[in-house]
From Swiss-Prot:
One of its GO terms (cellular component) is cytosolic large ribosomal subunit. Keywords: Ribonucleoprotein, Ribosomal protein. The keyword Protein transport does not apply. Residues 1-22 are annotated as: Disordered. This is Large ribosomal subunit protein bL27. GO terms for molecular function: structural constituent of ribosome. The gene is rpmA. PANTHER family: LARGE RIBOSOMAL SUBUNIT PROTEIN BL27M, RIBOSOMAL PROTEIN L27. It comes from Escherichia coli O6:K15:H31 (strain 536 / UPEC). GO terms for biological process: translation. Belongs to the bacterial ribosomal protein bL27 family. It comes from the Bacteria. InterPro entries: Ribosomal_bL27 (IPR001684), Ribosomal_bL27_CS (IPR018261).
C-alpha cells in the first residue's frame, strides 16, 4: 500500500537558450569587413563610420580597420566606428 499521495506534475521547469549577446571585438582590435562587432537587442551601441547594422541590431564592420568606441552627443550615446589602418 502506498504511503504517499501521488505528486502533481509541475508546469514550470523550462528556460530558453542563451543568445550569446555582447561585444565580440573590443576597442583597438583589428577587424575585417563583415566582422561582427556587437550582438545586441535594441540600440545600446549606435553605428558610426564604416559600421553597419543587421536586422537584429547586430553591429558589423563595413571596412577593414581598427574598432573605436566613443560616447557622443547630449544624450551620451555609445557609438562604434572603424578607423581605416
Amino acid at each position: 500500500m502506498a504511503h504517499k499521495k501521488a505528486g502533481g506534475s509541475t508546469r514550470n521547469g523550462r528556460d530558453s537558450e542563451a543568445k550569446r549577446m555582447g561585444v565580440k571585438r573590443f576597442g583597438g582590435e583589428s577587424v575585417l569587413a563583415g566582422s561582427i562587432i556587437v550582438r545586441q537587442r535594441g540600440t545600446k551601441f549606435h553605428a558610426g563610420a564604416n559600421v553597419g547594422y543587421g536586422r537584429d541590431h547586430t553591429r558589423f564592420a563595413k571596412a577593414d580597420g581598427k574598432v573605436k568606441f566613443e560616447v557622443k552627443g547630449p544624450k551620451n550615446r555609445k557609438f562604434i566606428s572603424i578607423e581605416a589602418e
